[in-house]
Structure formats: C-alpha cells, structure tokens
C-alpha cells in the first residue's frame, strides 16, 4: 500500500545547439565513467529512516555523514563537464543503482559491457549500512551518480576531479556480452530488478 505522498511530474525543456545526449548514445570501445559513489541517495534515505536502528552499526559521525549525502544528488555540474568533453551518453543512476544504470546504457545502445566492480567508488558508511540491512549497494538507488560513456575516460575523470567531483573509470563498452569482473571472475550482468532499497531491513 502507498503510505507516503507520491508525486509525478512531466518536464519540458530546451536543448543547447539542438544537441541531445541520450542513454543510448554509447559506442563500443568507450570507457564507462562514474561520478560520486554507489548508493548515494539510498544511503541518505536509509540513514534517515532507520537512524535509531543503525546506531548499533555506525558511529554518530558516520550516521551524520551518511545523512549528509543528500547534498550530492544533483548531476548538473558533471553533466555540463561531460557534455563539453564530448561524452556520447549519460544516465543518472537512480532506481537499480550503479549496475542497473550501466546495464541500461548498454541495453539502450545495443552494446555489451565489462564492469570492473572493484573500481566502483563507495563510501564506508554505505558499506556498513548495506551490510547491516542485508542489501547490495551496487543495486541501491544512486541518484546523484552519473554514468557516462566517453573516449579516454581517465582524462574525463581527471577533469571532473579538478572540479571537485569524485569520478572513476569503472568499465568498458563492448560489441556484445554484459559482464561484471570480480576477483578475476567474469560474471553475467543481469537486467536490474527492484531496487535494493525496498529489500532493506534490520
């Protein structure tokens, strides 16, 4: 049952120079760049809604840090930087988290992808919360985290970092096949299901 207000919105905007970057504009051989951290919004939500229960797993400072992640939900600045750099696809990692967003970029672009799981940035607070609540932070809503497809991803990551935005290359787009590379293992990257947020419990 719906127990909280739900708001739906239709948004209309104008493009600059008639150029639009879609989720499906990636090309094989490009790098996958990620901004900020896995589970950005989900961490803030869980730390607020389950604050009392989480006190036995996190220090007061860690809880405050986790709740403060709500300040990082805008992707406007990195979008402008990536657009100017020449990125061909971008996707905000909302429901389904980082892995869901990467899968959607590959799916919409008709491509495969290799995801370097160990290179995905994540806050220690997020790890602790997800461990306590029995969920995977890679599938946790990550609004504020942008997934970008571009050539020479390391250079773009450096450009983002120069502007104070955490960024890392976490994958490579391929002609076919979608995989996660974990501890020298090559595991299938499956289509995202429900967000880990809905499975969280103490």
Predicted regions and their residues:
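Glycine-rich anion-binding loops of enzyme active sites
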Residues: 1-51, 172
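Solvent-exposed alpha-helices and their adjacent loops that cap or buttress functional pockets
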Residues: 1-4, 23-27, 45, 58, ...
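Active-site glycine-rich loop that binds ribose-phosphate moieties when present
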Residues: 8-22, 60-82
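Alpha/propeptide regions of enzymes that mature by internal proteolysis
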Residues: 10, 157-161
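Active-site-proximal betaalpha loop/short-helix elements
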Residues: 67-142
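A short beta-alpha structural unit
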Residues: 143-149
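Helix N-cap motif at beta-to-alpha junctions
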Residues: 149-155
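Acidic, Ser/Thr/Pro-rich beta/coil linker or hinge segments at domain junctions
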Residues: 161-202
């Amino acid at each position: 049952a719906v127990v909280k207000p739900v708001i739906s919105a239709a948004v209309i905007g104008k493009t600059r120079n008639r150029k639009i970057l879609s989720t499906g504009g990636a090309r094989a051989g490009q790098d996958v760049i990620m901004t900020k951290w896995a589970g950005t919004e989900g961490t803030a939500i869980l730390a607020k809604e389950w604050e009392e229960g989480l006190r036995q797993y996190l220090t007061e400072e860690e809880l405050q840090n986790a709740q403060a992640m709500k300040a990082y939900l805008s992707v406007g600045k990195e979008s402008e930087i990536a657009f100017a750099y020449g990125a061909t696809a971008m996707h905000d990692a909302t429901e389904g988290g980082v892995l869901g967003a990467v899968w959607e970029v590959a799916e919409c672009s008709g491509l495969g992808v290799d995801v370097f799981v160990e290179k995905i940035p994540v806050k220690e607070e997020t790890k602790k919360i997800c461990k306590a609540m029995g969920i995977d932070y890679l599938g946790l809503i990550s609004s504020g985290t942008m997934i970008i497809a571009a050539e020479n991803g390391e250079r773009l990551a450096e450009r983002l970092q120069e502007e104070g935005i955490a960024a890392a290359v976490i994958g490579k787009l391929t002609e076919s096949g979608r995989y996660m590379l974990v501890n020298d293992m090559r595991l299938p990257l499956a289509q995202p299901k429900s967000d880990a947020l809905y499975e969280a419990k103490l």
